[in-house]
C-alpha cells in the first residue's frame, strides 16, 4: 500500500523512541510524529541516575540524543506535526496533523504527560518570566537569587537540590507537614544548607509586571497568608512548579478507552481496546513512570504491533 506506514508512533519521548527503534529494526515502515520537540519530559531532567547503564554524567538530553540516533540509523522516519484528530476504527488508521495526514496499519500512542499547573492567578501570565517547570532549562537565570519550589515528591525535591547549585536559597513549598519524596532523597535535602521548607502551605497568587515580583503563600492550617517580595537588588525570584503531570490524551477522548484521570488503559502487551492501536509510556495507566519503564513499554508495543501487522495484512 503506497503511502501507508506499517507503524505510526505519536510522540517521541523514551517510549516513542524505543518503539521507533524496535519497529524500524523489524523492517517495518515506521514514522514517528512529534508535535513539539523530541524527547518528552526527560529533556528537562538534569541527571539520569536510575537508567541502567547510564554513566554518572548522563543527562536527559544526551540520553534522548543517543536514542534518536539509534532509531534514525535503522530507518525510522520523523516528522514534526501537531496531531489534531485521529480515526482509529478502520483497518487503516488515519492520523490528521496540522501539516499532513498519515495512514498506518498500526499505531502506538506515546504522547506522555505535561506538567500540572499550580493553578493560581498570575501563573500562566508569568510563565517564562520567573515561573518555570524546568530546572535544567532555567536554573542559571536565578544565579545567586532566591527560588521557591512548589511540590514535595521525588521530582520536586531532586530539582530543588539541583536549583540549590545556582540559587542563593531554595524554599520548598509543600501542602503537607512532611515530604512525599523517597527517604534517601529526603535525607540529602535536609542536609543541604541552602534548602528551607514551608510546610502546610500553598502558593495563592503570583504577581508582577512582565516579571515575577512577588508571591502570596497561604498556611493551610492557620489560614494566614504571607506575601514575599523580590529584593531590590535581584528585582525578581524564581518559582518552579513540580506537582505531577497531566496525560496528553485530549485528542484521543472518545476514540480510545481512558481512565478517570485521562490515562489510556492497556493490557500487559500495551494493547488498547481498539485493534491495532497500542499505548506506551507515561500516557498509559501504570504503577511506575520512569525512563526505563517507558522504554520497556515502547519495545513491547512495537513488537506487538509487528505481530498484529503480520497477522492482519498480506505482503
UniProtKB/Swiss-Prot annotation:
Superkingdom to which the source organism belongs: Bacteria
Disulfide bond found in the keyword field: yes
Catalytic activity: [thioredoxin]-dithiol + NADP(+) = [thioredoxin]-disulfide + NADPH + H(+)
Keyword entries, A-Z: Cytoplasm, Disulfide bond, FAD, Flavoprotein, NADP, Oxidoreductase, Redox-active center
InterPro entries per the UniProt record, alphabetical: FAD/NAD-bd_sf, FAD/NAD-binding_dom, Ferredoxin-NADP_redctase_2, Pyr_nucl-diS_OxRdtase_2_AS, Thioredox_Rdtase
GO CC annotation: cytoplasm
Subcellular location: Cytoplasm
Binding site for FAD: 34-41, 282-291
One record GO biological process: removal of superoxide radicals
Disulfide bonds: 134-137
Entry EC no(s): 1.8.1.9
Record-level Gene Ontology MF annotations: thioredoxin-disulfide reductase (NADPH) activity
Binding note for cofactor: Binds 1 FAD per subunit.
Coiled coil: none
Cofactor: FAD
Pfam families for this protein: Pyr_redox_2
Database matches in NCBIfam families: TRX_reduct
Misc remark: The active site is a redox-active disulfide bond.
Family per similarity comment: Belongs to the class-II pyridine nucleotide-disulfide oxidoreductase family.
Subunit comment: Homodimer.
Name of the protein: Thioredoxin reductase
Gene from which the chain derives: trxB
Amino acid at each position: 500500500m503506497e503511502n501507508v506506514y506499517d507503524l505510526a508512533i505519536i510522540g517521541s519521548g523514551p517510549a516513542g523512541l524505543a518503539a521507533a527503534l524496535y519497529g524500524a529494526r523489524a523492517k517495518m515502515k515506521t514514522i514517528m510524529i512529534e508535535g513539539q520537540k523530541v524527547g518528552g519530559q526527560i529533556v528537562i531532567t538534569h541527571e539520569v541516575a536510575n537508567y541502567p547503564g547510564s554513566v554518572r554524567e548522563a543527562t536527559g538530553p544526551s540520553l534522548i540524543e543517543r536514542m534518536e540516533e539509534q532509531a534514525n540509523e535503522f530507518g525510522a522516519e520523523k516528522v514534526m506535526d501537531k496531531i489534531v484528530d485521529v480515526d482509529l476504527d478502520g483497518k487503516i488508521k488515519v492520523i490528521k496533523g496540522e501539516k499532513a495526514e498519515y495512514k498506518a496499519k498500526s499505531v502506538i500512542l506515546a504522547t506522555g504527560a505535561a506538567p500540572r499547573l499550580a493553578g493560581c492567578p498570575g501563573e500562566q501570565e508569568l510563565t517564562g518570566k520567573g515561573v518555570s517547570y524546568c530546572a535544567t532549562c532555567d536554573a542559571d537565570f536565578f544565579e545567586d537569587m532566591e527560588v521557591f519550589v512548589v511540590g514535595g515528591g521525588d521530582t520536586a525535591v531532586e530539582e530543588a537540590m539541583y536549583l540549590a547549585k545556582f540559587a542563593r536559597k531554595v524554599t520548598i513549598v509543600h501542602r503537607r507537614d512532611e515530604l512525599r519524596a523517597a527517604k534517601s532523597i529526603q535525607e540529602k535535602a535536609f542536609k543541604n544548607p541552602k534548602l528551607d521548607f514551608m510546610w502546610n502551605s500553598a502558593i495563592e497568587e503570583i504577581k508582577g509586571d512582565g516579571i515575577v515580583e512577588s508571591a502570596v503563600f497561604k498556611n493551610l492550617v492557620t489560614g494566614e497568608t504571607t506575601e514575599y517580595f523580590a529584593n531590590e537588588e535581584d528585582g525578581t525570584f524564581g518559582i518552579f512548579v513540580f506537582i505531577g503531570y497531566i496525560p496528553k490524551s485530549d485528542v484521543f477522548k472518545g476514540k480510545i478507552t481512558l481512565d478517570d484521570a485521562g490515562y489510556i488503559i492497556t493490557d500487559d502487551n500495551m494493547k488498547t481496546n481498539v485493534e491495532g492501536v497500542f499505548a506506551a509510556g507515561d500516557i498509559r495507566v501504570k504503577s511506575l513512570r520512569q525512563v526505563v519503564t517507558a522504554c520497556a513499554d515502547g519495545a513491547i508495543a512495537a513488537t506487538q504491533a509487528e505481530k498484529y501487522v503480520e497477522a492482519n495484512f498480506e505482503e
